[in-house]
Structure formats: C-alpha cells, structure tokens
Regions:
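A generic secondary-structure signal
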Residues: 27-30, 85-89
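Active-site/acyl-donor-binding loops of N-acyltransferases
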Residues: 91-138
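A structural signal for short coil/turn segments at secondary-structure junctions
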Residues: 32-35, 90-94
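Conserved acetyl-CoA-binding loop-helix of GNAT-fold acetyltransferases
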Residues: 74-88
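A conserved beta-strand-loop-helix scaffold within acyl/acetyltransferase catalytic domains
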Residues: 1-74
C-alpha cells in the first residue's frame, strides 16, 4: 500500500518506466526479509493513507529513499509526523538518517528541520567524445 501511494504520486512528478516500480517492489521485498528495509505510513482516522515512505538500511545509515504525500497529508503535516516517528523508533541506535539530499531548496529546508546538514559528494564525469569534440565541450 505504501509503495502504491508512492507510485501514484510519482506519476505526477517523475518520468519513470512502468517496470521501475515492479523492480523496486521486488528489491524492497528482498531487503525487507533481510531486515534492511521498512516502510512507514500515516493514516487518517478513517484509515486513508496520507503519507508514506520507504527506508533502506546500509552501513549504519537509514536512507529516506521514497516518499509520497496525498494532498491531504501535506496540509496535515503528515510527512513531519512520519519522519518524527521514524526518528523516535530508532533513537539511541548507531544509525544516521540520510535524506539523500535535494537540489530543491524547500525540501532541503524541510530536512534541516530534523537536523539534516549538507553533505558534499564527489563525482567524476567522463567525456567519451572523439578528440576534436572533446576539446570543444568543456
């Protein structure tokens, strides 16, 4: 149900191939069996899922990998409640919550409310164009 909400919301924002969610669901099921993945959801009193997230665990980190909000969840602060519940459930553990960063300033600001700090990642870009074109493109 959590992955279905993510899938529904992603349809509005991201261009993902139809099979991507099926592959992710299989990966999630495998990792869940190994206790390396979990989902969190926030429900209304009527039982409607209004916020959902998938967390993956590796190397003393919990990755906030997939998240979605129903429009009602945004107005009710459901994402705040979801992340807060995750933090409370894992308090005192040797675990760092990694929000996977964001180039969107409003998301970075939201994450900073939970104590998130910016982390720089090194990257290498290989230019495999033929020599004359390689020098033109810099």
């Amino acid at each position: 149900e959590v992955i279905l909400l993510v899938r529904e919301q992603a349809r509005h924002f991201a261009a993902m191939a139809a099979g991507d969610f099926d592959h992710f669901k299989k990966l999630y099921q495998l990792l869940y069996k190994k206790e390396k993945a979990t989902t969190y959801g926030v429900y209304t009193e009527a039982g409607q899922l209004i916020a959902a997230a998938v967390f993956l665990f590796s190397h003393s980190r919990a990755y906030y990998i997939m998240a979605a909000n129903h429009p009602d969840g945004k107005t009710l602060g459901a994402s705040h409640a979801l992340i807060n519940a995750f933090i409370k459930d894992h308090a005192g553990q040797n675990l760092l919550l990694d929000f996977e960063g964001s180039d969107i300033s409003s998301l970075a600001f939201f994450y900073s409310g939970f104590g998130a700090t910016e982390e720089k990642y090194s990257a290498i870009h290989l230019n495999k164009l033929p020599a004359p074109l390689k020098w033109l493109k810099r």
